[in-house]
């Protein structure tokens, strides 16, 4: 398990108002999942996970207590998406906010998400 950062809880209340912890982690199992399902992506996006969570461009609606976080890294044009599961008071107390998956996305996919998914948060 690796800690990525602490959330700005107010920013992420658009997913759920019930956020008892700030800590965001990614487990070794989830890292392996990303490597298996999106070969070559983890090594490219890992340095930007903290930035994406701290300063997302968009947070989109997903499953309950889960958001799709979109971030463009302007110095290299990388667009990344990550799936963030928010820990709520109904979850086991030892759980944390966690990155479920993450990968690079293309500009057409990015635009498709913005057209077809509900935008919960947009950076200014």
Regions found by a protein language model. Give the residues of each.
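Ribonuclease/tRNase effector modules and their secretory precursors
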Residues: 1-124
């Amino acid at each position: 398990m690796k800690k990525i950062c602490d959330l700005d809880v107010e920013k992420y209340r658009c997913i759920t108002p019930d956020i008892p912890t700030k800590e965001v982690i990614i487990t070794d199992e989830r890292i392996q999942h990303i490597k298996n399902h999106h070969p070559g992506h983890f090594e490219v996006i890992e340095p930007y996970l903290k930035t994406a969570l701290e300063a997302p461009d968009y947070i989109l609606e997903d499953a309950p207590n889960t958001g799709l976080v979109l971030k463009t890294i302007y110095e290299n044009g990388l667009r990344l998406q990550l799936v963030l599961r928010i820990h709520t008071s109904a979850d086991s107390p030892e759980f944390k906010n966690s990155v479920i998956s993450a990968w690079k996305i293309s500009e057409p996919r990015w635009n498709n998400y913005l057209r077809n998914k509900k935008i919960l948060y947009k950076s200014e």
